[in-house]
Amino acid sequence: MNINIASHLQGPQRIVCLTEETTEWLYLLGQESRIVGISGYTVRPAKARQEKPKVSAFLSAKIDKILALKPDCVFGFSDLQADIAAELIRKGVQVTVFNQRSVSEIFSMLYQVAAMVGQAAQGLEKIAVMQTDLQAMAEAVSVRVANGARRPKVFFEEWDVPHISAIRWVSELMGIAGGDDCFPELALEPMGKQRIIADGAEIVRRDPDIIFGSWCGKKFRPENVAARLGWADVAAVKNQQLFEIKSPDILQPGPAALTDGVKKMHAFIIAWMDADQRSRAIA
């Protein structure tokens, strides 16, 4: 029996990614040739949808199709994919499930994946660029605040019925972008059901200046939010500060959230800061 030991020293060669963030990261590392299957929800990068077989949703997977691809590693995310992982493990497949919930944990995941495919040095370089950009953003916000700008209160709605508030990495990125999460205590809860706001009146009471909607892939409808009973006097509604952040840009705990997602929140927040500062100067 011939065994190519050297090939195993270069990390997994046939990877299935059950969520988008590992797919995007492997493409950014120039390691897309290792990917043999992806999630059907993958939109980043766009060419992945054209090049790679789709083998899973988020909560379900085509196990037979995955096995037919003969993967030597499957990347998954969170307890929500535990059943998929368990079934693949019982079939003899190597499965690595990440469970990142914070910005620092996302960076840790990125480094681990890079190291697994022999790209630790390149991974660290790309991570350093992202960290530098986030630090620069936070410092720019600090300068604005020192010059009289006010940080807006922000409600990030991850789902509409029931209301679900921001997961931890979104809340942290919101803070870097210049906003203050209206529900910081809920951001620490890892599970969506623990971040349900049963009484929408509590959102009204906290009176957010900005509302971001990212309804897990469902189109955000600002007009529906504005029409909610009792919401007419919420600052964000009165001032038409209701904006969509596309789910692939912010709810995938990987490169997208750390770059495009946080930048989009930052742009809306800075525009609000400038308008708020002008209105207070006139008053």
Give the ranges of each region predicted by the language model.
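N-terminal ligand-binding lobe of clamshell/alpha-beta domains
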Residues: 1-283
